Swiss-Prot record:
Gene behind this protein: MAML3
Family indicated by similarity: Belongs to the mastermind family.
Region (Disordered) location: 37-68, 119-148, 169-188, 207-237, 334-480, 503-547, 615-662, 691-721, 968-991, 1024-1084, 1090-1109
Task of the protein: Acts as a transcriptional coactivator for NOTCH proteins. Has been shown to amplify NOTCH-induced transcription of HES1.
Species: Homo sapiens
Designated name of the protein: Mastermind-like protein 3
PANTHER family cross-referenced by the UniProt entry: MASTERMIND-LIKE, MASTERMIND-LIKE PROTEIN 3
An MF annotation (GO) of this entry: transcription coactivator activity
GO biological process: Notch signaling pathway; positive regulation of transcription by RNA polymerase II; positive regulation of transcription of Notch receptor target
Keywords: Acetylation, Activator, Notch signaling pathway, Nucleus, Transcription, Transcription regulation
Covalent S-S links between cysteines: none
SMART domains linked: MamL-1
Organism placement in taxonomy: Eukaryota, Metazoa, Chordata, Craniata, Vertebrata
This protein's GO CC annotations: nuclear speck; nucleoplasm; nucleus
Length: 1138
């Protein structure tokens, strides 16, 4: 069983989910289905208990006393699921039939009401006596003047009842009362009452009838069994709708209850049953087969009390909010329900426990769901389900999703209820509903024995649902009182929190996670979370009160609850749980005093609260823990939260950050602070993390690609991505000065970061190039010329070096532009010139995109590691190395990194290790030629390149602005003289200021590498250079240049922006000089072959790159259909690139 316990639990859990979904879709689901007369309900009922039992007991329990085999369990589950499906289909059919019947009955009722109304009006107008109509209506006789209004009101009520029955269908009405989850129970309990209401005399006996297994719960289900089922089929939306409708539902329920089920006893039960019998709404229609006469009786009864009904309905519809109506009906129904139902005796402890659990769950249940999402779900999936079976499982499921889905009323209600008594009441139903779920979950979890015991005992089909409803009603009332008290306490606490907001905000955020972590324990330990809640605000700095803090946290976190709850589900919670719990345990107990002494008392440290108030407050709260711990833990937590939030929100936050990149760093910080509560706190410290950003932004911004644009600002980048590491530090310090200092530091760091990023990016690019080279070699080994052309593309990647040129913001903007332009130009060039064709040959689509991305700084590396190395093999591998080595002045260092990455390329390896240029030549040549060969390309395509490519992309995109233009300008040059564009002279001029001077050496080698990479293509690329020296020396010198450090010069040219850097960006900008054998060789002023070989790969790379100075010829040759075009065509043909 141990082996199968988990599968059984999982399978059962899945079946539970399926069953719960099916059952919920089946109308009230669990209990309703179980209550259904069909034998299939028995299967679902056993299904849920079995599922719960199996899940709870770890397998043997439930449907299968013993799980001998996983297949057996699965088969049983399948059978049960099939049975549920069949039952669902049957219910749907019955529902449709019943719906038609109901429509007919409703029409009849409407017609009869209308006729009666006309008759009454005629009598009133003629005789002015409404008494004659219903001699049994003394009140109406006395109220002949108001009979018209009464009739009209009755018509209105019946219409509303019809609409609501049609729209919400009574089964959901009851569900709504107990909560979204209660749909499982409420339909059942409704059906129970409906059954009882079948003989409405029994309604007086409802307490005794409640235990009825709802043998007739489907008596209405028979008419409308599928109504709840179908509605539960749409159970979640139905519940939501019903929740929205619940306000009306009481009204509906009143007339509905009065419509049929209460017909006989309606006069007797009017006040009670009206409130109690929202459950009976379905019976209206069900019994309404004889509804005309019954409705006449009902209406006579209603007419008897017509004034009261009018008042009630008018008040309900007009004066009383739907929430209040729900509360009234729920409370009254619950009150009567509790006394009426003798079984609540067992439920009463549960309701109390559940009330306590619920009261905390109202605060903590959300915490259960949020932090306890693992816990709450296990609890929901555990014995609670087994005991409560479907009823519990569904509420727990509904309540559990409520946490992930803040929109779900239970969670929101639970969360909000502590916040606002009205919401607490309005949710009052919903929180009790989740309360039921929590009763089931927390009660089942914490009170598992009592919850499962009493619940299991009442678990008789209807009784458990009704009991749950009763418990829900009691709990709702209690929860409302608790929530009101808690809310009052929370209000006080909130005031205290407002005072302590800065501390509490962080505390709450952390504790929201922590309490979410602890909350599952909290509810049982502190049934009344409110009491502790009061204490929490008293000493918000007292983190030990994680549970208490959560309640206040919930209202303050109301806005953040979704995020926090979502974050609770996110890995952050784990980190936050880890960080926060230990912080709460150790730092709270130890740091409470210290915190109070440290920063809790020194709120002035949070003098930046104006902007950082939220941020600073959490830092202050963190200081409550420890001056350092808050920073470290906050940074960790905030980083985690920010990273998670960013990861969660990355699509929007990067967008936000993209524009932020254009914003001033301070504005970015403010925006980030404002936009992100959690982020804001770390943002408070954002200035300090700038260093961390420098380090992390390389990784973090990479992860959040667009983040890089904001990262270069440092503050923005930090806030967005890297800030999580350091953001916490600024909190207590004057952020204005710190921010300035941080900006300065960040700027200085940004350079370092860029270097680091380039190193990382180069590594990533090398990995990507290697990976791509491997893939491309495999694809292109049959297409050597394409490989050559692909290397030509590598000059595109060379532009990636430009990433460093522009400001991160500019680069970010340039990235998109350069990416688009590079994609367009690169694709045009790919079509026009073999360059792009080369990229496609390696990764036809990738190179086309890579050309575009090469400007972006990513695709060129990732997409065409081989061609990119070929073009500027360094651009992918060497460019990274060159860029970074240029920054660090060590091309070999990165080349060595690439060397191991490109070790597969024997030449490239030696070259790489020997020289970054060798790397480029190797990657370019080996990637190009070996890519043809496959081993080198394989070595080059290593996955390391892509990460750097990505990271480089961010940076390249930054540099893309300058090289954007030249890449755009040079892109056509690239395609024709692709190396020219890759010189990125335009972009590298921007980078020229950046530490890329060493790249000056590389550009020549890069041009060579381009030639090498494009042995044939380089000739076309650098027809002159190739014609000159590279053509002959390309193959031979490729090996030599590959083995030579010359490749570094090739890299410099390969990253023409690098020579553009060192020397004339204009020349680099020039497509012909793009590879700067001319421009860079001007810098190095060597013959293309000489420069290449002299510069590190003078022969192989230099030869080809000398062609780059001849980029015009190369462009002409390529444009004129040189081998580049042919390669492009072949690549396009191979890869189907347009």
């Amino acid at each position: 069983m141990g082996d199968f316990a988990a599968p059984a639990a999982a399978a059962n859990g899945s079946s539970i989910c399926i069953n719960s979904s099916l059952n919920s879709s089946l109308g009230g689901a669990g209990i309703g289905v179980n209550n259904t007369p069909n034998s299939t309900p028995a299967a679902p009922s056993s299904n849920h208990p079995a599922a719960g039992g199996c899940g709870g007991s770890g397998g043997p329990g439930g449907g299968s006393a013993a799980v001998p085999k996983h297949s057996t369990v699965v088969e049983r589950l399948r059978q049960r699921i099939e049975g549920c499906r069949r039952h669902h289909v049957n219910c749907e059919n019955r529902y449709q039939q019943a719906q038609v019947e109901q429509l007919e009955l409703e029409r009849r009722d409407t017609v009869s009401l209308y006729q009666r109304t006309l008759e009454q009006r005629a009598k009133k107008s003629g005789a002015g006596t409404g008494k004659q109509q219903h001699p049994s209506k003394p009140q109406q006789d006395a109220e002949a003047a108001s009979a018209e209004q009464r009739n009209h009101t009755l018509i209105m009520l019946q219409e509303t009842v019809k609409r609501k029955l049609e729209g919400a269908r009574s089964p959901l009405n009851g569900d709504q009362q107990n909560g979204a989850c209660d749909g499982n129970f409420s339909p059942t309990s409704k059906r129970i009452r409906k059954d009882i209401s079948a003989g409405m005399e029994a309604i007086n006996n409802l307490p005794s009838n409640m235990p009825l297994p709802s043998a007739s719960p489907l008596h209405q289900l028979d008419l409308k069994p599928s109504l709840p089922l179908q509605n539960s089929g749409t159970h979640t939306p139905g519940l939501l709708e019903d929740l929205s409708k619940n306000g009306r539902l009481p009204e509906i329920k009143l007339p509905v209850n009065g419509c049929s089920d209460l017909e006989d006893s309606f006069t007797i039960l009017q006040s009670k049953d009206l409130k109690q019998e929202p459950l009976d709404d379905p019976t209206c229609i069900d019994t309404s087969e004889t509804s005309l006469s019954n409705q006449n009786k009902l209406f006579s009864d209603i007419n008897l009390n017509d004034q009261e009904w009018q008042e009630l309905i008018d008040e309900l519809a007009n004066t009383v909010p739907e929430d209040d109506i729900q509360d009234l009906f729920n409370e009254d129904f619950e009150e009567k329900k509790e006394p009426e139902f003798s079984q609540p005796a067992t439920e009463t402890p549960l309701s109390q426990e559940s009330a306590s659990v619920k009261s905390d769950p109202s605060h903590s249940p959300f915490a259960h769901v949020s932090m306890g999402s693992p816990q709450a779900r296990p609890s929901s999936s555990g014995p609670p389900f087994s005991t409560v079976s479907t009823a519990t499982s569904l509420p727990s499921v509904a309540s559990t999703p409520a946490a992930p889905n803040p929109a779900s009323s239970p969670a929101n209600c639970a969360v909000q209820s502590p916040q606002t008594p009205n919401q607490a009441h309005t949710p009052g139903q919903a929180p009790p509903r989740p309360g039921n779920g929590y009763l089931l979950n927390p009660a089942a979890v914490t009170v598992a024995g009592s919850a499962s015991g009493p619940v299991a005992v009442p678990s008789s089909d209807m009784s458990p649902a009704e009991q749950l409803k009763q418990m829900a009603a009691q709990q709702q009332q209690r929860a409302k009182l608790m929530q009101q008290k808690q809310q009052q306490q929370q209000q006080q606490q909130q005031q205290q929190q407002q005072q302590q907001q800065q501390q509490q905000q962080q505390q709450q955020q952390q504790h929201s996670n922590q309490t979410s972590n602890w909350s599952p324990l909290g509810p049982p330990s502190s049934p009344y979370g409110a009491a502790f809640t009061a204490e929490k605000p008293n000493s918000p700095m007292m983190y030990p009160q994680a549970f208490n803090n959560q309640n206040p946290i919930v209202p303050p976190m109301a806005n953040n609850l979704q995020k926090t709850t979502m974050n609770n589900y996110l890995p952050q919670n784990h980190m936050n749980m880890i960080n926060q719990q230990p912080n709460n345990l150790g730092t709270n107990s130890l740091n409470k005093q210290h915190n109070i002494l440290t920063y809790g008392n020194t709120k002035p440290l949070t003098h930046f609260n104006a902007d950082l108030s939220q941020r600073m407050t959490p830092p202050v709260a963190n200081p409550n823990k420890n001056p350092l711990m808050p920073y470290i833990q906050q940074q960790q937590q905030q980083q985690q939260q920010q990273q998670q939030q960013q990861q969660q929100q990355q699509p929007p936050p990067p967008q936000l950050q993209a524009p932020r990149a254009h914003l001033s760093e301070d504005q970015k910080r403010l925006l980030l602070m404002k936009q992100k509560g959690v982020m804001n706190q770390p943002m408070a410290y954002a200035a300090l993390p700038s260093h961390g950003q420098e380090q992390h932004p390389v990784g973090l911004p990479r992860t959040t690609g667009p983040m890089q644009s904001s990262v270069p600002p440092g503050s923005g980048g930090m806030v967005s991505g890297a800030s999580p590491a350091g953001p916490g530090f600024l909190g207590s310090q004057p952020q204005a000065a710190i921010m300035k200092q941080m900006l300065i530091d960040q700027r200085a760091q940004l350079i370092e970061q860029q270097k680091q990023q380039f190193l990382r990016e180069q590594r990533q690019q090398q990995q990507q190039q290697q990976q791509q080279i491997l893939a491309e070699q495999q694809l292109q080994q049959s297409h050597l010329p394409r490989q050559h052309l692909q290397p030509q593309r590598n000059p595109y990647p060379v532009q990636q070096v430009n990433q460093f040129q522009g400001s991160p913001q500019d680069i970010a903007a340039v990235r998109s532009q350069a990416a688009l332009q590079s994609m367009r130009t690169s694709r045009l060039m790919a079509q026009n010139a073999g360059m792009m064709g080369i990229g496609p040959s390696q990764n036809p689509g990738t190179m086309a995109t890579a050309a575009a991305q090469s400007e972006m700084g990513l695709a060129p590396y990732s997409t065409t590691p081989t061609s990119q190395p070929g073009m500027y093999n360094m651009s992918t591998g060497m460019t990274q190395m060159l860029q970074h080595p240029n920054q660090s002045g060590m091309s070999i260092t990165h080349n060595q990194a690439q060397g191991p990455r490109q070790p597969a390329s024997g030449q490239g390896v030696g070259m790489v290790s020997g020289f970054g240029q060798s790397m480029l030549v190797n990657s370019a040549i080996t990637q190009q030629h070996p890519q043809m060969k496959g081993p080198v390309g394989q070595a080059l395509p290593r996955p390391q390149a892509p990460p750097r490519l990505q990271s480089l992309m961010g940076t390249v995109q930054q540099g893309a602005q300058s090289w954007q233009q030249r890449s755009l300008q040079g892109m056509p040059g690239r395609t024709s003289g692709e190396l020219g564009p890759f010189n990125n002279g335009a972009s590298y001029p921007l980078q020229a200021g950046q530490p890329r001077l060493t790249k000056q050496h590389f550009p020549q080698g890069l041009s060579q590498s381009v030639v090498d990479a494009n042995t044939g293509t380089v000739r076309t690329l650098n027809p002159a250079a190739m014609g000159r020296q590279m053509m002959p020396s390309l193959p031979g010198q490729q090996g030599t240049s590959q083995a030579r450090p010359m490749v570094m010069s090739g890299l410099s040219q390969g990253v023409p922006g690098m020579p553009a850097f060192s020397q004339p960006p204009a020349q680099q900008q020039i497509p012909s000089g793009s590879f700067a054998p001319s421009s860079q060789s001007q810098a190095y002023e060597r013959n293309a072959p000489q420069d290449v070989s002299y510069n590190y790969s003078g022969d192989g790379a230099g030869g080809s790159f000398p062609g780059l100075p001849d980029g015009a010829d190369l462009v002409d040759s390529i444009i004129k259909g040189g081998p580049g075009d042919e390669w492009m065509q072949e690549l396009d043909e191979l890869f189907g690139n347009p």
